[in-house]
């Protein structure tokens, strides 16, 4: 079914080129159904790229999905045109009375700072708390997963000796959990981070369930509150060339960076990536939308508590 996106969002034309069915608000109003309302708090620097990556994965849904973009007042994006932010993003203060069937909170390039040192920490933790009573299910990604686990459950993060960078093999610990419907026993996920959360800390908290891990990249997915909170440390949403872009950017800046592991054909940047995560990325997002948003949310959205 189609995605309902804000009129003239750049992702619309980009995704139409991939034969993904999206409609704008003008056409969606002609369909007499209640769409699933999904809000995305996009903390990534390249917001248009992240918008496109997430919208692509939200395209396989059981119902029309209405996408809104949230921003925080205490931080100004330096890598996205101001006009784009004004047109497509809304301050949290103006959305706090609204309710949503689902929410996605992205990663952010602040993981090497202590949580409390992040200039928008107070505002984002207010959003974390707000989501618990205004959203049916929230998906925290990468830094947001670490931040959410720390804020809600006191789980610390730890600095890595070197960047976790590449495509890593994962396994499911509860293969019958609905979030893994259709998954293979092993699957691949991109990671790009300097910090980690650890299994032993997760297992100490009875409210948390570890769902998936990797021998190389550690904790991948944690669930809480019966599926109302998912914490995902990797970047399943990444497009095929995202790690390549990050690698070449750091090389051009003279930064210490290794070739992303298990990513390029024969580990040769000139041969391009071998994409092994796309199928499971689509399953992850469609399962989340189906089993934890669509099937759990009340018909009257005001009944979300």
UniProtKB/Swiss-Prot annotation:
Instruction: Name the predominant localization.
Output: cytoplasm
Gene Ontology molecular function terms on file: homoserine O-acetyltransferase activity; homoserine O-succinyltransferase activity
Recorded catalytic activity of this chain's protein? L-homoserine + acetyl-CoA = O-acetyl-L-homoserine + CoA
List UniProt keywords, sorted A-Z. Acyltransferase, Amino-acid biosynthesis, Cytoplasm, Methionine biosynthesis, Transferase
Active site annotation, chain numbering: 142, 235, 237
Q: Where in the cell is it found?
A: Cytoplasm
Record site: Important for substrate specificity: 192
Pfam family example for this protein?
A: HTS
First-level EC class: transferase
Q: Which domain of life is it from?
A: Bacteria
Gene3D superfamilies cross-referenced by the UniProt entry:
3.40.50.880
Q: What is the recorded function of this protein according to its Swiss-Prot or TrEMBL entry? A: Transfers an acetyl group from acetyl-CoA to L-homoserine, forming acetyl-L-homoserine.
NCBIfam families associated with the record: metA (TIGR01001)
Q: What is this protein called?
A: Homoserine O-acetyltransferase
| Organism name | Bacteroides fragilis (strain YCH46)
The encoding gene is metAA
